[in-house]
């Protein structure tokens, strides 16, 4: 809508959970590979194979970008979401690589997302993002282009003056895949949490 960037900060007033920025590619790939043990239809296995293939084949940022494009553009993805929701993901111990970058097992995040947004491909995109818990008084900062979603809790959101909103799923509104791919920062990295000064 306008040329302004939109960095944001969320300040937690209550216990708060957010998804923000991408987890390491190996962790994301391991999360999707967990789905291979399920009884999936050939169509869902094809989509899952394309996602995992993209995560293996390119540099990290290109791999994450390509995987998001596949998830959001393949018309068979809602079927994969539904099948994984029915079968569930087995919970794994905290040290498992698929849990890297997530405060909880990604299986829990997926269950929460499909409960609120059934059939939505964004539930799979959510598995690719860092899950960050905030305590009251903590804040999370995000540069422009960092994909994020707020899961629960109450907070104060502060952002630069901009009308720009590009969605990556978890919505009934239009998802502009081309625009999302053009402006999203697909580099993985640890979220920037700011703790309150206790002085």
Label every model-predicted segment.
Residues 1-138, 148-199:
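Active-site region of the double-stranded beta-helix
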């Amino acid at each position: 809508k306008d040329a302004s960037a939109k960095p944001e900060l969320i300040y937690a007033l209550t216990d708060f959970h957010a998804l923000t920025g991408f987890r390491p590619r190996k962790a994301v790939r391991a999360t999707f590979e967990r789905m291979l043990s399920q009884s999936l239809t050939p169509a869902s296995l094809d989509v899952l194979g394309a996602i995992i293939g993209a995560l293996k084949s390119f540099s990290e940022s290109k791999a994450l970008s390509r995987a998001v494009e596949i998830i959001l553009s393949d018309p068979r993805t809602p079927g994969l979401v539904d099948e994984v929701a029915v079968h569930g993901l087995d919970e794994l111990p905290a040290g498992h690589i698929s849990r890297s970058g997530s405060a909880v097992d990604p299986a829990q995040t997926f269950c929460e997302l499909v409960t609120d947004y059934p059939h939505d491909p964004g539930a799979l995109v959510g598995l690719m993002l860092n899950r960050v818990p905030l305590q009251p008084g903590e804040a999370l900062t995000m540069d422009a282009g960092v994909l994020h979603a707020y899961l629960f809790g109450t907070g104060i959101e502060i952002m630069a003056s901009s009308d720009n909103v590009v969605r990556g799923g978890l919505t009934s509104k239009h998802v502009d895949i081309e625009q999302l791919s053009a402006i999203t920062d697909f580099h993985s990295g640890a979220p920037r949490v700011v703790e309150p000064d206790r002085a």
